[in-house]
Amino acid sequence: NTIPLQECAEKGIVVFNTPGGNANAVKELFLFGISMAGRDILGAMKWVYEYDGSEGPIAKRMEKIKKQFAGPEYAGKTIGVVGTGNVGSLVANIALNLGMKVYAYDPYLSVDAAWKVSRRVFRVATLDDLLKHVDYLSLHCPLTDETRGMIGEKQIAMMKNGARVINYARGEVVDEDAMIAALESGKIARFVSDFPTEKMVKAPNAVLTPHLGGTTGEAEANCAKMAAVQMDDYLKNGNIRNSVNFPDVTLERAGSARICLIHRNIPGMLTNIMPVFSRDGINIENMTNKSSGEFA
């Protein structure tokens, strides 16, 4: 979220990302997250490290106080997964293997992503349909104008009392003030997020990590390889794959020369461009044009 995408597009700079490169790393972090969302493991760990021995040996004292950190098992519970792309599809499938009933919501589901999700996952048509069913909610959607603040006061009110929310999407997908209020009231039993803020660290029952989703050696290597392949294809062939500010566009290499043009997505642009080639006696053997928003 730190790159000025619009400014880059205005200057013809293609910005790539590497979707799926860290998907397994985030899936594995989800296993930590759902465990922390259930029992108060964080509180229990704090107790262990802060215990000063004033009430006797730790081995005896812990047996008397451990029930205060108890929580539910996730086997047999219902989880809702919002976003079933590279990460969400893995999370949905592993939740099934944990013995959970899984609902999924993704209005932008691609055909490729659909094949990755088990048939045992229940798909719902709206977010509201998902929220009313779940004991756990796991977020794995991109941050867009539509998803910003997607989980707010209204959506939280639809959920079961004592539901648990895991956010490995983007921090802004959740309305922070609404979530803090829900934690304070007990409406949400626990909130696990990889996106800490100064306000959220003070909230009760919030378990926060410093954006650890892709922090494995394997994930970093995967992303680096994907980025190198995508950049090489763009520089050599003009193909754009996995850009966040331009549409995906690919064309098999046929001739010895290739021209990649970035232009405004307005009527008449191609009509103005084509005569330049005709004037210089250049034949266009094949071409493709894709647009997205203001640019093509």
Label the predicted regions:
Residues 191, 201-204, 212-296:
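NAD(P)-dependent dehydrogenase/reductase Rossmann-like domain
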Residues 12-24, 169, 211-213:
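Short beta->alpha connector loops at strand-helix junctions that form conserved
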Residues 19-78, 242:
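Phosphate-binding beta-alpha-beta segment of Rossmann-like dinucleotide-binding domains, i.e.
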Residues 88-89:
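N-terminal Rossmann-fold NAD(P) dinucleotide-binding loop
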